[in-house]
Amino acid sequence: MPTETLQTGSMVKPVSPAGTFTSAVPLRILNKGPDYFRRQAEPNPKRLSAVERLEADKAKYVKSQEVINAKQEPVKPAVLAKPPVCPGTKRALGSPTLKVFGNHAKTESGVQRETLKLEILKNIINSSEGSSSGSGHKHSSRNWPPHRDTTDLHRHSFAESLKVYPTPGHGSPQESSSHVSRRLLEQSAETFLHVSHSSSDIRKVTSVKPLKAIPCSSSAPPLPPKPKVAAMKSPEADQVEPACGVSRRPSLQRSKSDLSDRYFRVDADVERFFNYCGLDPEELENLGMENFARANSDIISLNFRSASMISSDCEQSQDSNSDLRNDDSANDRVPYGISAIERNARIIKWLYSIKQARESQKVSHV
């Protein structure tokens, strides 16, 4: 080991902590004093904004004296005005005007605009309130006639449907007494329907028991002997019987001719396409019109049978107590012979035979 290194090592002295602190901190920071450290110890020291810093250094980069003397104010964010109060809440609170909250630092032009808007809103609100009050006064002073256009018609039609017409050939006093009770039931139903026309009220009317019949005269002839079936009935069943008959009667009746006309009202093009299977007139002349008679008759008979079945069902639901009417409706019914599946099968078979005939004609011509 050289002697120089040993000499330098022996010359090194131990450094105290104060010496390390003074050597670590630069001299320029120590010369600033304790105020510099107090400012840094503060939690939120106030810093200059960019505008203020530029304002302080303006003389360095601006040449004209006017710009140097002019002071630039920082741009503040505009405060948005709150939305206007709803008219319903305004009327409930009783405030006649709308309050618009804005910034306190508005210019005169902005204030004038706000006042102009408020005046316009006041005029609109006052005009709308005046028109609504005037219209309400007119409606209150006007005497409207009672609504009789639709309700009276429905009530009249329902009362007509409730009417029970006497059947010919029965003129007994018991029938007249039941007719009187039915008339009383109709009157009570009319007065009840005048108040309300809902379905629940109609059900209540049909379920009400009829009032007792008033005898026509004290000198009425004795009643004829009743048949065995009628003798087995109890008086309670006799009272409930008119109500059941009223509930079973349909309100609308259509004849067979009306139903058949409605079913036969179809377009001519559609009917021709279905009856003649979409063939051209030239092909129909070549094949012969007599081949289409069977298919047309099947289709027409099917339409007529469907219409007659609907009409017979309506007649069957009219009156279950009159045996004569049920017999007539049973005799008027047309028996349902051909089903829809069988008719379709016949049409498909017929079309297939026409196709085979056309192919055979082509082969014969060749």
From Swiss-Prot:
The modification Phosphoserine is found at residues 234, 297. Keywords: Cytoplasm, Cytoskeleton, Phosphoprotein. GO terms for cellular component: centrosome; cytosol; mitochondrion. The gene is Fam110b. The keyword Ribonucleoprotein does not apply. Belongs to the FAM110 family. The keyword Phosphoprotein applies. Pfam families: FAM110_C, FAM110_N. It comes from the Eukaryota. Residues 127-152, 163-182, 216-252, 313-333 are annotated as: Disordered. Its main location: cytoplasm. It is found in: Cytoplasm; Cytoplasm, Cytoskeleton, Microtubule organizing center, Centrosome. Residues 322-331 have a biased composition (Basic and acidic residues). This is Protein FAM110B. It comes from Mus musculus.
